[in-house]
């Protein structure tokens, strides 16, 4: 068994977007390895992504009954609850698929939590075929997110966070 070292500071990297993600994923894994607390892990993942990419907002919403409820995040204050099918987060939850929105003002039913947000990517967190939350990332730049972000954020959610979420019984 490989033991991950404690990460006290992120190694901020330069290079292509893919290279930055490839460098960041092992650091995120080291941050959360061995920690069973969901809030602590999601908080550290949010902080790592925000610190590396300097996006406007990075955070999680978790499914509680019939709505998404704000979880750990980094950035300006945010909407606390989102109904299924509403806005980008609620639509990604409803459709159980990643959504990239180049211009949030053109997204039907967009929920404007911050007037500074111009583009957004939302990645559902799926366990046993059920969406249990979403990773939401906002940028101040229109058209900021692309297939590279989709690929690596899905990898972070599925391959890193997924392993450390508490098992529901």
Task: Describe these PLM feature segments.
Residues 2-72, 163-169:
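Intrinsically disordered, low-complexity terminal regulatory regions
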Residues 7-13, 138-156, 163-168:
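Regulatory loop-to-helix N-cap segments in sensory/regulatory domains
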Residues 57, 122, 134:
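Short hydrophobic/aromatic beta-strand element in the GNAT-like acyltransferase core
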Residues 119-126:
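A short, aliphatic-rich beta-strand micro-motif
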């Amino acid at each position: 068994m490989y033991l991950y070292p404690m990460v006290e500071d992120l190694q901020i990297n330069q290079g292509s977007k893919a290279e930055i993600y490839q460098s960041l994923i092992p650091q995120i894994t080291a941050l959360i390895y061995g920690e069973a607390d969901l809030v602590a892990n999601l908080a550290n993942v949010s902080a790592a992504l925000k610190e590396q990419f300097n996006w406007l907002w990075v955070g999680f919403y978790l499914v509680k009954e019939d709505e998404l409820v704000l979880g750990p995040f980094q950035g300006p204050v945010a909407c606390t609850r989102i109904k299924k099918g509403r806005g980008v987060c609620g639509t990604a939850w409803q459709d159980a698929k990643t959504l990239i929105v180049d211009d949030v003002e053109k997204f039907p039913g967009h929920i404007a939590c911050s007037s500074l947000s111009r583009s957004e990517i939302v990645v559902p967190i799926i366990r046993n075929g059920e969406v249990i939350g979403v990773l939401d990332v906002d940028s101040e730049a229109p058209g900021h997110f692309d297939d590279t972000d989709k690929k690596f954020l899905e990898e972070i959610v599925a391959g890193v966070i997924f392993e450390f979420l508490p098992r529901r019984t």
